Amino acid sequence: PYLKLKARPRRRNITAAEYVEGIRKGNVTMLGQAVTLVESQLPEHQSLAQEVIEKCLPYTGNSKRIGITGVPGAGKSTSIDVFGLHVLNRGGKLAVLAIDPSSELTKGSILGDKTRMEKLSVQKDAFIRPSPSAGSLGGVARKTRETIVLCEAAGYDNIFVETVGVGQSETAVHSMVDFFLLIQL
């Protein structure tokens, strides 16, 4: 009468070298897992995340980094959808790091920016990673700089960083990008 569930086999731990190999080969699943590892606040993940970042550093610095900000509702995500398709049509690869505001109470986030990038989100040479700001100031997530390193190591030659929205705290992204774009109503 009761449904018997089989225990799932425990996943083996992935090594830093395996993460880097997957990232370098353009494996987006491995890239996504590495970003999750870097964003994790668990102490047991931090040393592995640091090792992955260090091993990726030699493959960085060759991208165009663009920070995109504006008041909520100005059309940041919609503009990224259009700009991103233009980048891809010219033969580039694009990573979009979309930072969403988080609830002060739960630190959770809707992570809805990706849904507004309808055309871009289905392109094979586009990687869109929504991340909660989790209370970080500066318009970016706590580990945005490290995520940029991972995306560059994966061969993304264009990186857009969409901030939570314009305000007096939108300064941290400025030091991470080559160009800063303000979208106004």
Model-based region annotation:
Residues 1-20:
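Charged, compositionally biased N-terminal leader segments and the immediate start
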